[in-house]
Amino acid sequence: MKIESVNVTVFTYPTRRVSDSAGHSHPGEESLAKMAMLTITAEDGSKGYSFAPPEVVRPFVVNAFFRKVLVGQDAFNRERIWQDLVHWQRGSAHQLTERALSFVEQALWDLAGRKLNLPVWKLIGGYRDRVPAYGSTMCGDELKGGLSTPDEYAQFAETLVARGYKAIKLHTWMPPVAFAPNPKMDVKACAAVREAVGPDIDLMIDGYHWYSRTEALYIGKELEKLNFAWFEEPMEEESM
């Protein structure tokens, strides 16, 4: 089943999510945001879709790499297509990113699932038919309606538990917030959430690599006392 075409459609949709200068998401006034839909079509008309930021799948990337590699290949040969794209990465001057490759792979899996009338989880082995979900906060901020204090984190966590979540991951304050990172304030937010939700909810935190080694060690020891299950990306890997 050969691939016949690769196309991208950019569309707008209403959202109340805004991004700061570091790319972190926060609540905001309703506005229009852009999204791109990548469509891979096979010769029999089967289609697969994925959704990406428009800048990741911009026309140059689609024309210079996606179409050059994909058109004419068997849509089921995902690993071969992946390796062929990787071959072009080194000389792409960072145009063909890992994110771009991931959206191609997602669309190919979607195409296979639609063609075979099977969910992708069955195509990759079917070990589980369900997975646990966790609620996730946005990053801390100083915005109205956002997460500006430990108490607001606690209140948001209570809302997530009321919706049925058994686990929660926190994203605390990060640059460009003026006072971030602030390890002691982050620990206060973690403690407030633990007190609010009780001992039976699994808690996690994503440090987004802002802490130093000593700060990460301090936070890790405090999280251990609070029985947190996971401390994600506490510092830059180069800091090891």
Identify the role of each PLM range:
Residues 3, 45, 66, 104, ...:
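Conserved, mostly hydrophobic/aromatic
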Residues 22-25, 119-120, 154-155:
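Glycine-rich, charged/polar anion/phosphate-binding loops
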Residues 41-116:
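Metal- or metallocofactor-binding catalytic centers and their adjacent structured scaffolds
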Residues 105-145:
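Glycine-rich, aromatic-flanked loop segments that form ligand/cofactor-binding clefts
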Residues 130-240:
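Metal-dependent enolase-superfamily TIM-barrel catalytic cores that perform enediolate-based chemistry
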Residues 1-50:
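Structured beta-strand/loop patches that form or line metal/cofactor-binding pockets in enzymes
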Residues 29-32, 124-127, 195-197:
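Solvent-exposed alpha-helices and their adjacent loops that cap or buttress functional pockets
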